Amino acid sequence: MEQQLPLLAPDSKAATSSPLCLTLDNPTSTSTSPAVPSSAPPPAAALEPSRQSFHERETDAIKAKIMSHPLYPALLRAFIDCQKVGAPPEVVGRLSALAGELDSRAEDRYLQGQSSDPELDEFMETYIDMLVSYRQELTRPIQEADQFFRNMEAQIDSFTLDDNGSEGGNSSEDEQEAGGGDMASAGLPEITSPCAEDKELKSHLLNKYSGYLSSLWRELSKKKKKGKLPRDARQKLLHWWQLHYRWPYPSELEKAALAESTGLDAKQINNWFINQRKRHWKPTPPAMEYRSLQPAGAASYGGASAGASTSGGGSAVVRGMEGQHFTGGGAYPRGDP
C-alpha cells in the first residue's frame, strides 16, 4: 500500500485518474510535494459518469463474449422458434429465413473451436434449454385448439355426409347434377367459390334440421319466463286489489274472471295474491272495523251515562250496517279465504 501513496499527490495527474478506493483507503500522504489546502471532495454527480462508463464497458464485454460464443446461433435459433409460435404465416416465413442464415453461421463458428469459459458454456446451455421448454409450453395450447377445431370440422362433415336420405339433400344433389350437366353440355368449366360452398352448406343444414329447430322453438316459446308478470295483467290485478283492499281474497269466480281478463292461469293469480298479501296487506282488527262503521253523531254521546251511550252506539252500528251488501268493502270475507 505504501508504494501507491505517491499517486495521491494533489499536483499529480495520476492522483486524478486513480480509483476512488485508493483515495478512501489512504487518507494520509507522505509525499514530498508542498502542502496545499485540502479541497472539498468531488460531488457524487461527477463520479456517476465514470461509474456508468465502467458499467457500460463491462456490459459490452459480456455481450461480446456471448455473441462470440459457438452456441450463440443456437441461442438465437431457440429464441426465433419462440417468436414463431402463433405468428402469422408471413412472419413465420421471415423468421425461418433468418434461422437458415443462423444455421450457416453456426457451422462456421463450430469449426473455429470451442469456448474456453466453462461458466459461460453452462450459461448458454441452460438458457437454450429454458427457451426450448418455453416454446413447448407455448405450442401446447395452440395444438390443442387446432385439434379441437379439426374434430369439429370432422363432425360437421359427418353430419352432411350422413344425410343421403333426406329430401333437402336429394333435391340439392339433383340440382347440382342438373347444373353440372348443363355446364358440361355448354362446354363451360364448373366454378365453385368459398362463398357459394358456405351458402350451400347452410341451406343443406337448414333443410336437414329445420324440423328440429322449429319444434325446439315452439317448446321454448311455450315456457314462460319466470319473474314479473305482464304489465297489463299486473295493472288489472292491482286495480282489483285496491277495490278489495279490506279483504283481498278473491273467490273462485273472481279468479276465473281475472284469469280471463289478464291471460294468466290460476296458479299465477294465486301466487300473485299470496305474495301481495304477505308484502302489502295487514288485516284490520274487527273493533276498528266496527268503529269505522259507527256514525259520527253516535260519538257525541258520552260521559253522562255510559250504558246509554253504549246502547246508543250499538244501535247506531246496527243501523249503519243495514242496507250494506258487503261487496268487498265490508269487514267480512266475500269468498273463500
UniProtKB/Swiss-Prot annotation:
Low complexity composition bias: which ranges? Answer: 27-38
Q: Which GO terms describe its molecular function?
A: DNA binding; DNA-binding transcription factor activity, RNA polymerase II-specific
Q: Would I find DNA-binding among this entry's keywords?
A: yes
Q: Which of UniProt's keywords are assigned here? A: DNA-binding, Homeobox, Nucleus
- This protein's major location comes to nucleus
Name the domain of life.
Answer: Eukaryota
ELK domain residues: 200-220
Native organism: Oryza sativa subsp. japonica
Write down what this protein is called.
Homeobox protein knotted-1-like 4
**UniProt DNA-binding residue ranges:** 221-284
InterPro entries referenced in this protein's UniProt entry, alphabetically:
ELK_dom, HD, Homeobox_CS, Homeodomain-like_sf, KN_HD, KNOX1, KNOX2, TALE_homeobox
Compartments where found: Nucleus
Region: Disordered, residue numbers: 1-56, 159-190
Q: Which family does it belong to?
A: Belongs to the TALE/KNOX homeobox family.
- Output a single Gene Ontology CC term carried by this record: nucleus
